[in-house]
Each structure stands twice: as structure tokens, then as C-alpha cells.
Amino acid sequence: MQRIVAGIDLGGTAINYTLLNADTGAFLIPGLAEHPARSKEGAQVCLTQIVDGLAATAAKYGVDRGAIVAVGLDTPGPASATGVLSAKGSTNFVHASWPGFDLRGGLEQRLGTPVTYLNDGNAAALWGHMSLFGSRPATSVSAIIGTGLGGGLVVDGRVVEGRNGFGGEIGHVLIPCEAIPALGGVRPPCNCGRFGDVESVCSLTAIERTLLPMFLERYPRHPLGGVAPGRAAKEVRSYAERGDEMCRAIFDTQARALGLFFDQVTNLLDPDAFLIGGGALEVSPEFQAWWLAAVRAGMPPQREEQEPRLHIVPNGDAAGARGAALQALRGMQSAASA
């Protein structure tokens, strides 16, 4: 019987699944398999959704539930390295039952199958790294842009999680905002309590809270000025893709913030590659190329031998589930060789 590893990416509204053949390394799901998360209804409700969604996904792709020998799970942070949700959880985990909830342990108990855990940024970073380098020795740093800014550091195919599981929380690294002329000296606030970190400029939250209001003052007749802030922030990307001047300027500001962060990392780690992913980059190849050029322009000039390699994390929203599956496969292989 074939041995299958499941990858589960828990988001705020949806759970993404993938299935990986442990013997061949082939993914059985080419794109996304989704199931409603219902995370705002509490931990136990969401846990049931995860289990039910996995059963439905396995059935859809002709996989016997008993063939699933390991599961990889990722969630938004902050959480411990073992999958215990922090009291300062993400906006997806606002129900009173979430703080301190052992999601990994609870899922393992429900399934009766070993479950490994990764932060969602680390999971996507692992998939991006392995897609680019495979088993070759290399170091990569990833930025995953969504509601916030996640990411990960991967060294020779291993995620650097850190002592408490907070390794790769790149969004909360401070950057020199004064080097971004469009900000006019402003150091925007972040939900974490810091001012002027990367996430405070480069995230959907940053667009809604800081950048869109700032640029609408400069473009008072822009159509987005008459749209509710939350909805308007989500429409900035489509306007920018069509070449809208104001929205391109917003994305350029975000790119320059990320470029400044990458510059700091280059001087600290000199990685083999930077990878960028998340919903913000699910755009046309032309817009991706423009935005990567803007990120590079935001980096102060480097020595020629330090010229950074910038890449897009493949497979879009499926990246997290795929990275979680790879982590579970590695855990299974390590246990077998111990």
C-alpha cells in the first residue's frame, strides 16, 4: 500500500491540503484542496473542520485514510515550536479557547497519526527553498506577504525555527524608514507594538492602515477614496497591475521596504537567494518582474559578488501545505533512521 503524507495549511477562513507520496516524492494534488476553517468559532470547532477536511480530501483523490502515515501542519504565528498557540495569537485566533491551545497535539490525538508543526511562513519558505535548491547545500531567506509579513530562514534544507519557534519572524525587524522618501519620515505602527518594522510597510495591513490613507492625501480624486478602507486596500493590487499611478507608488514603497530588509540580511548572512511569496505576488509575470526590480532598486548598491538572487515562491497559496508535508516527511524519515 502506498504511504501518503498530508500537508495542512490552516488559514483564517480556509484550510489548504496537499497529499504527498512518501515513496516517490510526488504530490497528488496539483493545486489547492480547500475546506472551511471556522477558526473564529473556537479551537474544537476548527479542529473538527481540519479532520473532516482531510477525510474529504483523501476521498476526493482516492487515498485510503489508513494510507496517511504522517501529517504536517502549519498555522499563522505566534505559536511555540510545538504548535501551542500564543496568548498573543494572530487575528485568526480571537476566540477565547485559542490561547494556550495545543493544536498539534490535539490534531495528533484526533487522527492517531504523527503530526509535525511549522509556522506558516516557515512552511512556505521551506517549499520555496526546496523547489529552488532541492538537496543542494544552500541558504535562503523568504518573505511571505499577506495580511502580515511572515517568512523563514532555511539552511541546507532545514528550517531555522529558533529556541521558541520564532525564527524567521522577519516582519518585525526594524528598517531605516527614513531611506524611503515616500514615507516622508513616518515610522508606521505595527500590531506587534513596534514602529517602522518591515511589516508596518510591507503587508496588506500596512496598505489599509498607513499607505492608502497617506497616498489618498496626495491623490484626493482617486476612485479608491470613496471605497471602504478594508475593501479599498484589497483593490490596490488590481489597480497597480493595470498601471494605476497611485497604486504603483504604494507597491513601490512596499518593495523598497523589503529591499532595505534584504540589504541588512545580505550583510548578515549573504544567503544564496531571497524568495518572495504570498497572495500579494499572485499577479501577472509582467507585474512580478516590475515589482522584483523595485525590490532590487530598494537595496543599496552591493559589491558585484554580492548581487542578490530574487525569486518568487512557486505554487502560490499551496506553498504552505507543501512545505508542511515536506517537514512531516523529513520527520518520518528521521524517526525511521533513529
Residue spans of the language-model regions?
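Glycine-rich phosphate-binding loops at beta-strand->alpha-helix junctions
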Residues: 14-15, 265, 269-295
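N-terminal phosphate-binding loop and adjacent alpha-helix
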Residues: 27-67, 96-98, 242-245
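Glycine-rich phosphate-binding loop of actin/hexokinase-like ATP-binding domains
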Residues: 133-201
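Short glycine-rich, Thr/Ser-proximal phosphate-binding strand/loop in the N-terminal lobe
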Residues: 2-48, 86-90, 165, 175
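Phosphate/pyrophosphate-binding loops at sites that engage ATP/ADP/AMP, CoA/4′-phosphopantetheine
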Residues: 50-71, 114-115, 262-274
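Glycine-rich phosphate-binding/hydrolytic loop that grips phosphoryl groups
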Residues: 7, 116-130, 282-338
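A mobile "lid/hinge" subdomain adjacent to the ATP/sugar-phosphate binding pocket shared
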Residues: 188, 194-273, 308
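Glycine-rich phosphate-binding loop and adjoining helix at the ATP-binding site
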Residues: 44-48, 67-70, 77-139, 184, ...
